[in-house]
Amino acid sequence: MTDINNLFFELIQVAIGTRICLSHTPSADEWGELYAMAMKQSLVGVCFAGGQKASPQPSPEGMGEKSLLFRGDLEEAYIPEMLYFTWMGMAVKIQQRNETINRQCVELQKRLSADGFRNYIMKGQANAALYQCGVKNGSVSSKGSSLSALRQSGDIDVYLEGGLDRVLAYARTFGEVKKVNELEMSVPVFSETVVEFHYRPFIMRNPFKNRRLQAFFQDQSEACFTNRISLENKAESLEIMAPTIAFNLVHQIVHIYHHFITEGVGLRQLMDYHFVVKHEMEVEKGSSVQEVKKVISDLGLERFASAVIWVIGYVFDPGMLATWIQKSETTLWKPNEKDGRLLLDEIMMSGNFGHTDERAKDILTSRWKAFWFVNSKTFRFWRFDHWAWFWSPVWRVYHFLWRKMKGFK
């Protein structure tokens, strides 16, 4: 890892409360790089929280333009004024967006339930609710806010009980359904927010592993349909139905792996998983550890999970990583540094869902380019799944034919 990468990780750690201060005072150029990295990884709001001990001060000599002074517990760090206000503006927009999506999640679930569909919200706002570490000494809003309000939200992913045909028929009552795949469909519920109706929580392309995964989801379904969690909104108390921690531990590791060997995965997904693991170990007291380890073993993802555990420890909580290495029985999987560094290098290159990965810039222009790009990754990362090189292209061909037979685009 480069020095700027390590400084970026320190900024994240300060934001989430696992570090007191940065190891050195960033220069104006370094602050610019940190902001660019936060943008690339979709962590703009969370990283801004790392600087929430700010107070206006005169610019020190040699810094050039007027700056704002950040006082950490052990040091001072300067950030250029224009960059600060740009960053703060992004953070405020993220807060406002989260407030909107929180209300939309509640509204959507009320409608689905009234129409006879048991459901639960996956990822997104359900993950944000686990961001329990508060921002110290104020926030981007005058009333203060926890990190959950600063997590960059995307679309709304909601699982509906009933299977493809029933869910699709219902989705069409909202308007034209333009995209249907093996998991989900895009439904025009809200004009400003993409909503995905899932008729499966997720899949694996290996049919034998997928059978085991679907069995796990089915076993967890009753608990998920009744698992009520609270969302943070300024002036109102909001609740949604969301997956259990055991469900999240399996579902999100499979989700991370899928995006890792396709377009790419970013640190936002790893931060989500960090808070899922933190909740399991600190709140649930490890009650699901043995069950989750068994399922991940059955899915053949133990080695990948060990890489993920190393990454979330190294990036988000180095102190906890040291404990996990010394006492591997206290965590889900023993951290694997060699594989973890490989995974982290890919994460830093690809960014959030690979949107800034120069290696993948042509995959949206050609299905064949996308096909070969993904298949080449299954060979490169053979260590994590010895049969992905076979099942990935087989599944993609099958899925293409399935969509054509169903009349889906």
Predicted regions and their residues:
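Cationic, low-complexity basic patches in intrinsically disordered or flexible, solvent-exposed regions
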Residues: 58, 67, 133
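Intrinsically disordered, low-complexity segments enriched in serine/threonine/proline/glycine
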Residues: 55, 67-69, 77, 139, ...
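Conserved NTP-donor binding/palm subdomain of two-metal-ion nucleotidyltransferases/polymerases, i.e.
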Residues: 1-52, 78-137, 149-154, 159-409
